[in-house]
């Protein structure tokens, strides 16, 4: 049985300026509020400078400055963003240990992407000692918040018995959740499990259904499996 590997990717920096306090913030308003010490504004200003949103000229040094200020004032989003800067080496020297530290701070505050990223670093042993039990812990927290990549990696840990007792039933459960959230690798793995009767009785109809969904998403392995099942 061919099972696709864990999703060892960390998402590129995708930031949003939407919040209840600043539905459509002007640059001048954000700058003023940031200078007054408001952490939401400091975070937003940092993101503007980091991404060039709203016509702001990118300035990584200033982005780092304002995100650091927001972090010191308790902004969870700033902690995550600083982690991403260190992880990608954007505006700072790439430093996996620092990335780990910032992801850990944001993860402790319930930030789902940070929890997933922390799980990945534990899983890979980057920025910290490899620890499957900790990877399981943080994937679980992010998965419970409905974060699809975490659902997928959690299923993979159950399937392989890494950091947790091996359980095809639990692997099937979490692959299903990820598959329903359009994770094509999860759709493929779920189809394989139904095809082979792992975690559930064999079910060719469901196997074909999930192979088809993965194939529709562009998975070449799923396309080959569908041909072999015709």
Model-derived regions, located:
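Canonical positions in the second alpha-helix
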Residues: 33, 69-70, 105-106, 141-142, ...
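Structural signature of tandem alpha-helical TPR/SEL1-like repeats
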Residues: 23-28, 57-66, 93-102, 129-138, ...
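TPR/TPR-like alpha-solenoid signature
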Residues: 43, 80, 101, 116, ...
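Short helix-capping/linker turns of helical repeat alpha-solenoids
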Residues: 35-38, 52-53, 72-75, 88-90, ...
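Bacterial N-terminal signal peptides
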Residues: 9-18
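Terminal, low-structured helical/coil segments at or just beyond the last alpha-helical repeat
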Residues: 201-230
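Bacterial N-terminal signal peptides that target proteins for export
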Residues: 1-9
